[in-house]
Amino acid sequence: MSFSPQEALHRTIEHGEIFFDEMVDLMRQIMRGDVSPMMTAAILTGLRVKKETVDEIAAAATVMREFARPVPVADTSNLVDIVGTGGDGSHTFNISTCAMFVAAAAGARVAKHGNRSVSSKSGSADALEALGAVIELQPDQVAAAIDRTGIGFMFAPIHHPSMKVVAPVRREMGVRTIFNILGPLTNPASAPSVLMGVFHPDLVGIQARVLRELGTERAMVVWGRDNMDEISLGAGTLVGELRDGKVREYEIHPEDFGIAMSASRNLRVDGPEQSIQMLRAVLDNEPGPALDIVALNAGAALYVAGVASDIGDGLARARAAIANGSARQRLQQYVETTRALVA
């Protein structure tokens, strides 16, 4: 007998936990469109108010992965996702998108999962499109891009078509729900390592433990104390690191890596064009906080991907990839490859 939406709603109202198998059953019903929009909204609200547990999030992510269109990557060694939940309200340029090119040029392979802007001035899809890349690639084309360039961008609407069932509900609700934290957990290429930024400090430990439940090998979940879903230059950054099946929580600071502190306002942009200008300046090795934050985040990605021995080593590799022009070349190679794949 399936777990009824009514029971789920009652459980959340009473601040009770929905167990893993129950949540799997419930999410399948929601993703199939078997639960009414009104009931779906009520359940999502109940989960948000009581705060989602590790098991609830892991179960929901498991079902989203079931319903996704997977990317057939034959070799996932050194494959990493650099992703953020968004919603931090910082309106910075596309740091993780820029870090993707740097990390790939420095030896990692990146399978980035993203979408258009929801809360920021420029989402990863918006930035890549402005750079001239084709973002609406099919799963086999993304796999080919990874094989040829070490980079693949998975545009969420193509890989998660079943999300259209809940899209109207989410849009009408207009508040964060569990779906805001599921996207970064549902990489269609099954990247074994992840650098994930989150919008709230409570999610640092939670998301790291969810990733462990989902079988991720290595991960860093980060939240900057200046409310950035990146490793920040403006304050300390809380880290939940998953390694060898254990989650360790700690804090890092830019000074730990010889980087001067800089307020996030120095990285803010008004839209995709300004974001692209800043991204290109970084890849042209223009000194400043934009280059520093990209190199630091790319360095962390290289660490979790197993390319670097620690973040400091990753930072050095990232800076070298920017300075020698290979990161800029990787951007151009990626843009040309995506165009060729659809020609």
Swiss-Prot record:
UniProt-annotated binding residues for anthranilate 2: R170
Enumerate the InterPro entries for this protein.
Anthranilate_Pribosyl_Tfrase (IPR005940), Glycosyl_Trfase_fam3 (IPR000312), Glycosyl_Trfase_fam3_N_dom (IPR017459), Glycosyl_Trfase_fam3_N_dom_sf (IPR036320), Nuc_phospho_transferase (IPR035902)
EC id: 2.4.2.18
GO cellular component annotations, sorted alphabetically? cytosol
Q: How is the cofactor bound?
A: Binds 2 magnesium ions per monomer.
UniProt binding sites for Mg(2+) 2? D229, E230
Q: Which residues bind 5-phospho-alpha-D-ribose 1-diphosphate?
A: 84, 87-88, 92, 94-97, 112-120, 124
An example GO BP is:
L-tryptophan biosynthetic process
Judged by the first EC level, this protein's enzyme class is transferase
Q: Which UniProt keywords apply?
A: Amino-acid biosynthesis, Aromatic amino acid biosynthesis, Glycosyltransferase, Magnesium, Metal-binding, Transferase, Tryptophan biosynthesis
Question: Which positions in this protein are listed as binding anthranilate 1?
Answer: G84, N115
Pfam families, sorted: Glycos_trans_3N, Glycos_transf_3
Kindly list the cofactors needed: Mg(2+)
> From the UniProt record, which GO molecular function terms apply?
anthranilate phosphoribosyltransferase activity; magnesium ion binding
Q: Which reaction does it catalyse?
A: N-(5-phospho-beta-D-ribosyl)anthranilate + diphosphate = 5-phospho-alpha-D-ribose 1-diphosphate + anthranilate
Q: In which pathway does it act?
A: Amino-acid biosynthesis; L-tryptophan biosynthesis; L-tryptophan from chorismate: step 2/5
Q: Which residues bind Mg(2+) 1?
A: S96, E230
Assembly with partners or alone: Homodimer.
By sequence similarity, the record places it as follows: Belongs to the anthranilate phosphoribosyltransferase family.
Q: Which HAMAP family match?
A: TrpD
Stated role = Catalyzes the transfer of the phosphoribosyl group of 5-phosphorylribose-1-pyrophosphate (PRPP) to anthranilate to yield N-(5'-phosphoribosyl)-anthranilate (PRA).
Record protein name field:
Anthranilate phosphoribosyltransferase
- Provide the species name: Stenotrophomonas maltophilia (strain K279a)
